[in-house]
């Protein structure tokens, strides 16, 4: 199976609660670029997303290109959640190509758990693609990566 981990696009400054922060126009463009890449190169069959607004907005770019792919909100993939707990829930998802849209630092920690490597930060709207027989710590291999335009 393929697991595609995606960080949300650029979000507005912290002028509202973290869970309510919106994507900037630039962040929308980043999410669109990454969604185009995913749909062009992979065939996602299930989306999992954080409940936070900016992750939901990022997922919307994917859903506009793959409207028949089911999606579910997973409450424990917000920025400071425990990656072990999140991975335990993700392990129950039945999919051949799973896309998970979430945040730093949990996205880096999930990638680290999957491969057994040290955590590495994700750029805004970056995706990393992993292959594994099943979801379990240390069992995945990173196969691909895409980074859209960045603001710096």
Residue ranges and their predicted role:
Residues 86-88:
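Conserved ATP-dependent adenylate/AMP-binding module captured primarily in the ANL superfamily
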Residues 95-115:
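A glycine-rich beta-strand to alpha-helix segment
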Residues 82-84, 152:
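Short, solvent-exposed polar/charged micro-motifs at secondary-structure junctions
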Residues 3, 96-99, 127:
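Residue-level preference for the first positions of well-ordered beta-strands
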Residues 91-102, 142-152:
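A polyampholytic, Gly/Pro-enriched intrinsically disordered region
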Residues 118-141, 147-151:
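Domain-level recognition of soluble alpha/beta enzyme cores
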Residues 2-81, 93, 107, 117-122:
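Active-site-proximal alpha-helix that buttresses catalytic centers in soluble enzyme cores
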Residues 5, 73-75, 129, 144-147:
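Structural signal for conserved beta-strand scaffold positions within catalytic alpha/beta enzyme cores
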């Amino acid at each position: 199976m393929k697991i595609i981990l995606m960080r949300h696009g650029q979000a507005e400054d912290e002028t509202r609660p973290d869970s309510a922060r919106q994507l900037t126009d630039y962040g929308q463009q980043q999410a669109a670029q990454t969604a185009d890449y995913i749909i062009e190169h992979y065939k996602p069959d299930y989306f999992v997303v954080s409940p936070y607004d900016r992750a939901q907005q990022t997922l919307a770019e994917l859903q506009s290109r793959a409207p028949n792919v089911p999606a579910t909100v997973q409450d424990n993939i917000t920025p400071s959640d425990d990656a072990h707990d999140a991975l335990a829930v993700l392990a129950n998802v039945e999919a051949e190509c799973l896309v998970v849209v979430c945040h730093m630092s949990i996205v880096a920690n999930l990638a680290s758990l999957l491969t057994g490597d040290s955590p590495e930060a994700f750029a805004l709207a970056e995706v990393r693609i992993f292959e594994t027989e099943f979801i379990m710590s240390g069992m995945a291999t990173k196969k691909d990566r895409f980074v859209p335009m960045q603001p710096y």
